[in-house]
Amino acid sequence: MMYRFELPTPLAYFASLVQSDEHFPLLEAAASLAQDDYPDLDVQQVLGDVDQLMARLKRRLADDAAPLQRLRTLNQFFFRDLGFSGNVNNFYDPENSYLNSVLRTRKGIPISLAVLWIELAQGVGLNARGINFPGHFMVKVNLPKGQVVIDPFTGQSLSREELSERLEPFQRRGGLVDDFEVPIGLYLQAAEPRDVIARILRNLKEVHQSQADWVRLVAVLDRLVVLLPQAWSEYRDRGVAHEEQG
């Protein structure tokens, strides 16, 4: 008797990754998003490429290196030696959201760069998380003497004053100023892995909508429905996209 082994579809594979919040593989889930455009992509190879970067980074650190030294070494390695930076010339290119492309070109958007940076940071023992900051995804590291917030698009660390300046336009737009001002600490809470993937997908959703790319839009919305089964607006938008697709 011949047994036929079939690989799961990209969507089924994604669904298997995002089932549990307790065991949510952020890097793998983020890497798998590219399979909509690269159906033959070997996600494990992408993870292996990141592991190789991790090994190179660890060779630069003494076992007893202090957290601040680990952070400085990571930033030197990631932003200067490897040359990761924001794609300022083509910010809305979908490739900026695909980790295989970001690893190849060293260009991305804040959230895709953040996913790679966080993976390396956690791999060298840093307490690093993403921040769903309005308009621009950030990363933070908790150190013994305080918290450092970094813009993954530039590698720049940001003070509370600089963060407040970036936040002010969004607060004014929402009427959250003066007596209704929200403490900045509420905007610096760690983003859960599911929320990170949702933000990447919604970035792609916005790009595909703006380009009237209905095929790609439906694929992204299929993932959003799997990721956020209670997000009824995504079901509605998927139905609209199907109608536009014909």
Regions found by a protein language model. Give the residues of each.
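A structural boundary/capping signal
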Residues: 1-246
